[in-house]
Curated annotation (Swiss-Prot):
GO biological process per UniProt: tyrosyl-tRNA aminoacylation
Binding sites annotated in the UniProt record for L-tyrosine: Y38, Y175, Q179
Source organism of this protein record: Ehrlichia ruminantium (strain Gardel)
Protein localization: Cytoplasm
Designated name of the protein: Tyrosine--tRNA ligase
């Protein structure tokens, strides 16, 4: 697809682009002038996780291409909860929890984007500023009358709940009106013309565009990214040990690096496009590496992704430490335990490995060790007592380091001919 706008061309070539309400007109506009665009994040946790990383990278690219991003922190809409993609109602958060989450998310976002008063500097805006002041009767008369309940019932966030006979509260039913109204407020306050979100937000985004048309505002645009899935079809952002948070205090930079280092071979090229800023020509060379060489591409992916999230020095330090761990034979003096490759391929539980290797006397003591956060594989804490080792844990190497506490370590070596 040939696009005039450098920003839209970048989204398309790197694999972000899903659909747009009027791509031709938006392309024309963005090729001629600085466009103000917004992405919203509800404040449901103290940090964002990598499920939000595509949107965060798009905020960076908006700045790099000379456009102005608005980050809308939904400290108002969080009081209701977005039903999109949810099988049941979200737990309502207290005002103090929402405030704490808002501050935490702001801290995370400021690592990725430049905020300020410059032409392409990001604005951080809070929708409680206008939602908390709404007069309900006026809102229904001026905004609610433009929405068809018949149409609202066709959106997946509503339709799927009703088809499954799952409760959808009137509170949640109002969410799409409030998100549409956010777009109107941002247009009137800041001349924002574009809303960007994940593909699950398409219905809500279209509502905002249509509301702008009915209110006779300048043309508004909506654009969505693909849903972030791994090559196995799983949602990205979670591991057996929990969410991959972007806050270094909630998920260590070393674990973050290791997460990207352990991605499947099939995901390397796509993730290099989405989560690094490397040139496409370099990415094409890296994704064409075969066999053991693909591990070099994974290290580059891990280091670049960690650099963007946690900074250059931290990323380089982790990459250097990983080099020592995996390539400098620092574990030559550790006791060795051999496991059969076929057993790992079937899924060897860490509990069983701890017992058969002699590191723990019984299954119960092995489970206690894990529950006490005393078990590590390659210095990454194992939190799930049901965790099973796979070849991914070996990171293309012939062994892993199994640790029990700070002083007991074992070199677990992979053997294919046992």
């Amino acid at each position: 697809m040939k696009l005039k706008s450098g920003f839209l061309g970048l989204l398309y070539s790197r694999g972000y682009f899903n659909q747009c309400t009027d791509l031709a007109e938006l392309d024309q506009l963005m090729s001629k002038e600085c466009v103000i665009a917004y992405i919203g994040f509800d404040c449901t946790a103290r940090s964002l996780h990598i499920g939000s990383l595509m949107q965060i990278m798009i905020l960076r690219y908006l700045q790099k291409c000379g456009h102005k991003p608005i980050v809308l922190l939904g400290n108002g809409t969080t009081k209701i909860g977005d039903p999109s993609g949810k099988d049941k109602s979200r737990t309502l958060l207290s005002s103090s929890d929402i405030q704490e989450n808002t501050l935490g998310i702001r801290k995370v976002l400021e690592k990725f984007i430049v905020c300020g008063d410059g032409v392409s500097d990001a604005l951080l805006v809070y929708n409680a500023e206008w939602l908390d002041k709404l007069n309900y009767i006026d809102f229904l008369r001026n905004i609610g009358r433009h929405f068809s309940v018949n149409n609202m019932l066709t959106f997946d966030s509503v339709k799927l709940r009703l088809e499954r006979e799952q409760n959808l509260s009137f509170l949640e039913f109002n969410y799409m009106l409030l998100q549409a109204y956010d777009f109107i407020e941002l247009n009137q306050r800041y001349n924002c013309l574009l809303q960007i979100g994940g593909s699950d937000q398409w219905g809500n985004i279209v509502n905002g565009v249509e509301l702008g048309r009915k209110l006779k505002l300048p043309q508004l645009f909506g654009l969505t990214t693909h849903l972030l899935l791994t090559s196995t079809g799983e949602k990205m952002g979670k591991t057996a040990n929990g969410a991959v948070w972007l806050d270094g205090e909630m998920y260590s930079p070393a674990d973050y690096w290791q997460y990207f280092r352990n991605v499947k071979d099939e995901d390397v090229g796509r993730f290099l496009r989405l989560f690094t800023e490397l040139p496409l020509t370099e990415i094409e060379k890296l994704e064409n590496l075969k066999g053991y060489e693909i591990n070099e591409a994974k290290k580059i992916l891990a280091t670049e992704a960690t650099r963007i999230c946690h900074g250059e020095k931290i990323a380089q330090d982790i990459a250097y430490d990983a080099l020592k761990v995996f390539e400098c034979n620092d574990h030559s003096g550790l006791p060795v335990f051999y496991v059969c490759k076929s057993e790992i391929e079937l899924g060897l539980s860490v509990v069983k490995l701890l017992q058969v290797s002699g590191m723990e006397k019984s299954n119960s003591s092995a489970k206690r060790l894990i529950n006490d956060k005393g078990c590590k594989i390659n210095d990454i804490i194992i939190l799930d007592v049901n965790y099973k080792l796979s070849l991914q844990d070996f990171c293309g190497m012939s062994y892993i380091k199994l640790s029990c506490g700070k002083k007991r370590h074992l070199k677990v070596v992979l053997e294919s001919n046992l």
